Protein backbone atom coordinates (compact mmCIF):
# COMPACT_ATOMS: atom_id res chain seq x y z
CA UNK A 1 0.00 0.00 0.00
CA UNK A 2 1.36 3.44 -0.91
CA UNK A 3 2.22 5.91 1.82
CA UNK A 4 -0.16 8.83 2.22
CA UNK A 5 1.28 12.31 1.91
CA UNK A 6 -0.23 14.70 4.45
CA UNK A 7 0.18 18.41 3.88
CA UNK A 8 -0.77 21.68 5.46
CA UNK A 9 -0.71 24.89 3.48
CA UNK A 10 -0.93 28.43 4.79
CA UNK A 11 -0.12 31.62 2.90
CA UNK A 12 3.63 31.42 3.61
CA UNK A 13 4.16 27.91 4.98
CA UNK A 14 3.76 24.50 3.37
CA UNK A 15 4.35 21.39 5.46
CA UNK A 16 4.54 17.88 4.05
CA UNK A 17 4.95 14.44 5.61
CA UNK A 18 7.67 13.72 3.11
CA UNK A 19 11.37 13.95 2.34
CA UNK A 20 12.90 15.51 -0.75
CA UNK A 21 14.71 13.18 -3.13
CA UNK A 22 16.05 14.50 -6.43
CA UNK A 23 13.69 17.46 -6.20
CA UNK A 24 10.62 15.29 -5.64
CA UNK A 25 8.56 14.80 -2.49
CA UNK A 26 8.57 11.19 -1.34
CA UNK A 27 5.93 10.36 1.32
CA UNK A 28 7.57 9.61 4.66
CA UNK A 29 5.37 9.42 7.78
CA UNK A 30 8.46 9.90 9.97
CA UNK A 31 9.60 13.22 8.50
CA UNK A 32 8.21 16.72 8.04
CA UNK A 33 9.44 18.97 5.25
CA UNK A 34 9.03 22.76 5.39
CA UNK A 35 8.56 24.92 2.28
CA UNK A 36 9.01 28.52 3.42
CA UNK A 37 7.40 31.41 1.54
CA UNK A 38 6.90 29.59 -1.78
CA UNK A 39 5.66 32.79 -3.48
CA UNK A 40 8.72 34.83 -2.40
CA UNK A 41 6.58 37.51 -0.80
CA UNK A 42 9.38 38.43 1.62
CA UNK A 43 13.08 39.22 1.47
CA UNK A 44 14.78 36.65 3.68
CA UNK A 45 18.16 36.93 5.35
CA UNK A 46 20.10 33.96 6.62
CA UNK A 47 19.14 35.03 10.14
CA UNK A 48 15.40 35.19 9.51
CA UNK A 49 15.41 31.82 7.74
CA UNK A 50 17.34 30.33 10.66
CA UNK A 51 14.81 31.81 13.11
CA UNK A 52 11.90 30.11 11.30
CA UNK A 53 13.80 26.83 10.90
CA UNK A 54 14.65 26.83 14.62
CA UNK A 55 11.02 27.55 15.52
CA UNK A 56 9.95 24.73 13.18
CA UNK A 57 12.32 22.27 14.89
CA UNK A 58 11.11 23.39 18.33
CA UNK A 59 7.47 22.90 17.33
CA UNK A 60 8.15 19.47 15.83
CA UNK A 61 9.91 18.49 19.07
CA UNK A 62 7.01 19.78 21.17
CA UNK A 63 4.58 17.60 19.18
CA UNK A 64 6.70 14.46 19.60
CA UNK A 65 4.50 11.53 20.58
CA UNK A 66 1.32 13.16 19.28
CA UNK A 67 -0.45 11.91 16.16
CA UNK A 68 0.96 13.23 12.91
CA UNK A 69 -2.36 14.31 11.44
CA UNK A 70 -3.89 17.22 9.53
CA UNK A 71 -4.91 19.01 12.70
CA UNK A 72 -1.44 19.01 14.25
CA UNK A 73 0.17 19.99 10.95
CA UNK A 74 -2.19 22.98 10.74
CA UNK A 75 -1.29 23.96 14.29
CA UNK A 76 2.43 23.93 13.46
CA UNK A 77 1.81 25.92 10.26
CA UNK A 78 -0.26 28.50 12.11
CA UNK A 79 2.44 28.92 14.76
CA UNK A 80 5.04 29.46 12.04
CA UNK A 81 2.82 32.06 10.33
CA UNK A 82 2.71 33.88 13.68
CA UNK A 83 6.50 33.79 13.86
CA UNK A 84 6.72 35.31 10.38
CA UNK A 85 4.34 38.08 11.45
CA UNK A 86 6.50 38.79 14.50
CA UNK A 87 9.62 39.08 12.33
CA UNK A 88 7.79 41.42 9.96
CA UNK A 89 6.47 43.61 12.78
CA UNK A 90 9.93 43.77 14.37
CA UNK A 91 11.40 44.95 11.07
CA UNK A 92 13.61 41.86 10.72
CA UNK A 93 11.70 40.75 7.62
CA UNK A 94 10.53 42.93 4.73
CA UNK A 95 8.18 42.53 1.81
CA UNK A 96 9.78 41.72 -1.53
CA UNK A 97 9.13 44.66 -3.90
CA UNK A 98 9.73 42.31 -6.86
CA UNK A 99 7.05 39.87 -5.71
CA UNK A 100 4.55 38.88 -8.38
CA UNK A 101 1.68 40.49 -6.41
CA UNK A 102 2.06 43.05 -3.62
CA UNK A 103 -0.90 42.26 -1.40
CA UNK A 104 0.65 42.98 2.03
CA UNK A 105 -0.91 39.78 3.34
CA UNK A 106 0.41 40.42 6.85
CA UNK A 107 -0.40 44.12 7.03
CA UNK A 108 1.14 47.28 5.68
CA UNK A 109 4.90 47.68 6.03
CA UNK A 110 6.03 49.39 9.21
CA UNK A 111 7.77 52.59 8.24
CA UNK A 112 8.61 55.65 10.37
CA UNK A 113 5.87 57.59 8.56
CA UNK A 114 3.24 55.03 9.60
CA UNK A 115 4.34 54.56 13.22
Curated annotation (Swiss-Prot):
One GO CC term on file: plasma membrane-derived thylakoid membrane
Location in or out of the cell: Cellular thylakoid membrane
Superkingdom to which the source organism belongs: Bacteria
Keyword Nucleus applies: no
Catalytic activity: a plastoquinone + NADH + (n+1) H(+)(in) = a plastoquinol + NAD(+) + n H(+)(out); a plastoquinone + NADPH + (n+1) H(+)(in) = a plastoquinol + NADP(+) + n H(+)(out)
Predominant location category: membrane
A GO MF term: oxidoreductase activity, acting on NAD(P)H, quinone or similar compound as acceptor
Classification via InterPro entries: NdhM (IPR018922)
EC number: 7.1.1.-
TM annotation in the entry: none
Membrane topology qualifier: Peripheral membrane protein
Primary role: NDH-1 shuttles electrons from an unknown electron donor, via FMN and iron-sulfur (Fe-S) centers, to quinones in the respiratory and/or the photosynthetic chain. The immediate electron acceptor for the enzyme in this species is believed to be plastoquinone. Couples the redox reaction to proton translocation, and thus conserves the redox energy in a proton gradient. Cyanobacterial NDH-1 also plays a role in inorganic carbon-concentration.
Quaternary structure annotation from Swiss-Prot or TrEMBL: NDH-1 can be composed of about 15 different subunits; different subcomplexes with different compositions have been identified which probably have different functions.
Family note: Belongs to the complex I NdhM subunit family.
Entry protein name: NAD(P)H-quinone oxidoreductase subunit M
Species assigned in the record: Synechococcus sp. (strain WH7803)
Gene coding for it: ndhM
